[in-house]
Amino acid sequence: MTRQIRVGDVLIGGGAPVVIQSMLNTKTTDVEGSLAQIKALKTAGCQIARLAVPNMEAARGFAEICRESPLPLVADIHFDYKLAIAAAESGASKIRINPGNIGGEDRVKAVVDVCKDKHIPIRVGVNGGSLDKRLLEKYGHPTAEALVESAFEHLELLEKYGFYDACLSMKSSTVPTMVQACRLFRSQCDYPLHIGVTETGPVKQGLIKSAMGIGALLLEGIGDTIRVSLTDDPVEEVYAAKDILKAAGLRKEGVNIISCPTCGRTRIDLIGLVNQVDEALKNCEKPITVAVMGCVVNGPGEAREADIGIAGGDGWGMIFEKGEQIEKLPYDELLPALLQRIEKL
């Protein structure tokens, strides 16, 4: 079991459920816009939100946002240690830094002292795209071993000043590298791990890479908090994270939708119907399985374990529960009737 840290009112590691995070894409100086996005993230199921703090103007905006945020906030800091101190003093619930890029040890100690005093954990964020030149020369390129060595160097720097309230991330845009790095680190250390694939590309590729990388580790019991990085609305990152956790058997809340791939027997717009069901139920937290099947020949039987579902006919369909037919309706009435029954479950 990993160590446990507390980010605001959220526990990470130590046997706590895997925590979902995302990062805002608003300007931190846009207080109103940032708060609106944080509220949308919370509605979607996000538990911790991270914001970029690139300068003192952003640090002032971060302070205002902290005062009204419904979620614990992480300040993402690079290069300037004074920004980390300002964020810690402004109400940050966690600081994300790379100790190697904020200056000499005296500056690292200054950040550590403030975080220790205010009981604010630090995430050491190691990234394949920003490894120290010395490690790149040693390993030739950003290997898993290079990421892990960098992580331990940074951890040792925090520990030198008596700071142990930390978590680690070792991210790469290459899935096997990220997975191997996290496995290697976990075999040697019990600090909690923040896992994710970075710079994943277009949304479709990003979803696949994230599901493979994060999912592989979760199935091995590795990973205490996750962020799905997508070139998209951050809210979509949260929905993807929830789906990954559900697929890995680590999340019971929320609807599990199963549907057939369609074939020549399909006589309804199954693809459109599945998308409508998915959209309508995306914020439903009921732990149920909903089936949307293309035909009545195999639909109810194949989806016998579903709590409720639809099987399509030729311009009509039927609603079934646990494989048993409940109601036969015209196609246009299927979705409203299904949602009404789900509401009563």
Specify the residue positions occupied by each region the protein language model found:
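N-terminal amphipathic alpha-helix/helix-capping segment at the start of soluble metabolic enzymes
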Residues: 1-23, 116, 279
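Active-site mouth loops of central-metabolism enzymes
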Residues: 15-33, 52-54, 71-79, 135-148, ...
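Hydrophobic faces of well-ordered beta-strands that scaffold small-molecule active sites
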Residues: 18-24, 49-51, 73-77, 95-97, ...
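Glycine-rich, proline-tolerant flexible connector loops at the mouths of alpha/beta enzymes
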Residues: 25-31, 42-68, 96-104, 166-175
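Alpha-helix-loop-beta-strand connector modules within alpha/beta enzyme cores
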Residues: 56-77, 110-122, 182-193, 277-279
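Glycine-enriched alpha-helix->loop->beta-strand junction motifs that scaffold or abut catalytic
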Residues: 69-71, 88-95, 116-119, 186-192, ...
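Hydrophobic or amphipathic alpha-helical targeting/insertion segments
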Residues: 82-123
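Catalytic alpha/beta core domains of metabolic enzymes, predominantly
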Residues: 127, 135-282
